[in-house]
Amino acid sequence: MTKRKSKKVTANRNYKDTVFRKLFSDRRNLLSLYNAINGTAYTDEMKLEIVTLENAIYMGMKNDLAFIIDTNLFLYEHQSTYNPNMPLRDLFYISSEYQKLVDRKSLYSSILLKLPAPNFIVFYNGKRKMPDRWTNCLSESYENQQGEPNLELKVVTININRDCNRKLMEQCRILGEYAQYVEKVRENAETMSLDSAVKEAVDECIQKGILADFLRVNRAEVIAMSIRSERAHV
């Protein structure tokens, strides 16, 4: 058995926003993404109840987007690197979500509490070659697991690099345009400095109508977030 050291859980005060999170914090964009993934056709974005824990950052991480629709709770996370520990991270996060949604006193009630069913999805656009879609399970972390695990949590990861999941990209135009923007940044970075690569990608996408309105309104912030994100994964 591996010896473990106890570590104090602290908030990650250096958490930085990402272009993905900012883009899909818009209810219309988020609903479009949800519809594309689930094969639905909702038009009223107010059906989305946003429950992202804005002020709670646990274990050095923060979930990007959390929302409830049709009594289901969805946790969306964007990742630029492969991370097999997402099930464990989401376990901590969903526990915090349920604590927020449930009155503690009702835990001692004789009436069964009803909870929104959780769904965990990661959107991956790292440079490492990965399949279009895969699933990680919490039980993969267990040592000496025998038989069916008594606690399981499954995270589905969807590859959103431009040449992957093309049908999904077509069904959610904003996601497809986001993939084009990221690809353009990386293409530019092969022949110029990262700062120049990002700025030129933003200008070119605006000219071509790729995320044009979003980039015009948030140009400076998008440039800063993109540079920080790409630099972190060089």
Q: Residue locations for each model-derived region?
A:
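Elongated, amphipathic alpha-helical interaction scaffolds
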Residues: 1-234
